[in-house]
Amino acid sequence: MYKKYLLLLACGLILTGCGGGGESESTFDSNTSTSGNGNGNGNGNGNGNGNGNGNGNGNGNGNGKYLVVPKDYDKPDGDKVRIYYTIHPATSSKQRIGILLLNFGGPGATAADRLLSKVSSMPTSITESFDIVAMDPRGAGKSAFARELMTCAVGGSCDSTYKEISPYMGSNAVIQDMDSLREHLNEDQINYLGYSYGTRLGALYAERYPTKIRALVLDSSMSPLHQNYEELRIDQAQGHQKIAEYRLDSKPKSMAKLDDIVTQTKDSDYTANDGGTIKKDDVNLILGAIKHPMREYLNNLRGISWSESKLGLSLSALFDKDEAKPFICWRTQCETESNSLSFSHIPKESFTSDEKRSSAMFRSVMCTDERATLDDSDIEGNEDKYLASSSIYGYYLKENLSGLCKGWTAQRSPIASQSEIKNNITEQVLIVGGLYDPQTSYNWSVEMKDTINNAALITIADTVGHGFSYNGIGSCLDDIVTNYLLEPEVKVTDRKCERVKRISYRYSNEAPTVPVNSAHSGDIHL
């Protein structure tokens, strides 16, 4: 089902995915679906019961708990499933405002096991004021359907499993779980901070439950315009091209050379003037590395610009002097260039069980959510649309990521349309978008801002990155997000923020490592 690069790139193109929970199946609930009165046993340090109305819970490992909810919300008295969540209580009962629900993106990743790390990056005013909550969505972590997805993904075929569970694990089901959790916690409203795919969940929740949302932050937003997966990827190509233009300092000759190399290597190798040979896999590596956000952060640590990095210099030689050997030299050393950090986009030979589960979940949710479905023939024949979006990245995305929903036969649960979001969300919403975001293109944040009648857009202008709030961009952004969460009724205006000059990451033996609370860690989906 997956093309050569599909599993790898699907795991790297949306904020979290292909991991996030443990790889051991023992971390999953052994009984994710119950029937009758909804009774189900919790695991870990405690047991819990559900009573059919979705308001039961049991303590799991650590601070985790289970919420019992309907498998199918259209049949509230039918089978029940359990949703795992964790809470970091507000540290000041006097300052407490309510709950702040976090979603780090996906679809495919956990959330509960990342909560404490994220809390550590938040200011005291937020941790004092909110019970901070993270919920593993259906299909991930310790929540329902995670075991089923892992089993079928490891076995190599999920078609029959998709037919059984996908109708009950799309975004519509998740936002209903979110509201069940709100009710269970006896809260009138929620505050929400969602990254990447989490912005889809936040917007859909606010559309369906407009009176139940107090504050809504959509960081690295998905677009409300995309009606299916192919539209998303086609649109993403032009966002990637903008990043290439930014990386190459908007040099027309460099962009033209890159375009020529991409075109030639579709059918044959490219031989440069110095005798070096560039193959199609090399081009995939180049295109992936140009848009990879961690390049930016590693360079920041070293105090150098993109053009001063080894990769930047080797590509300058290739594009400006038609010399391929510097890039070939870089390619052979790229695994050690950054010590513990690898940026190779060469397909992995193997994936962990949880990476496979995550990729299967990604397909399940993205295809279930589609509003306008495409015939297989339409998907196969859409290369011209990819190339119209970007002559450089169009073929790259078409070859490696198109066709995710080809052959999909499971029942869908279409998400709300742009007009429904526009008509039903009335409270002020804060949107954060990166001008050079490789996962959720900047125009998607603009489209979300234009859709919501009362919204402000904070633009991160000078970095290739994804997921920005409380992730090291600096006080310009974090203060805006914090003040909005504390007082969402205060009007926020559009503005630009720039990252701090140098981002400090944790170090181990003086080698930079990715902070586990970072939205830029290697487990990025949308």
Label each residue range with its predicted role.
Residues L258-N423, N517, I524-H525:
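Alpha/beta-hydrolase fold active-site neighborhood
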Residues A206-D260:
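A catalytic-pocket lid/entrance helix-loop region that shapes and gates access to the active site
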Residues I425, I431-G433:
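Short beta-strand/loop motif that positions the catalytic acidic residue
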Residues V464-S475:
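Catalytic histidine-centered segment of alpha/beta-hydrolase-like enzymes
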Residues P438-N443:
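Conserved alpha/beta-hydrolase "acid-adjacent" motif
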Residues L15-G17:
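C-terminal motif of bacterial Sec signal peptides marking the signal peptidase cleavage site
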Residues G20-C152, S254-Q264, T409-S413, A456, ...:
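Catalytic-loop region of hydrolases
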Residues V174-I190:
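Conserved acidic catalytic loop of the alpha/beta-hydrolase fold
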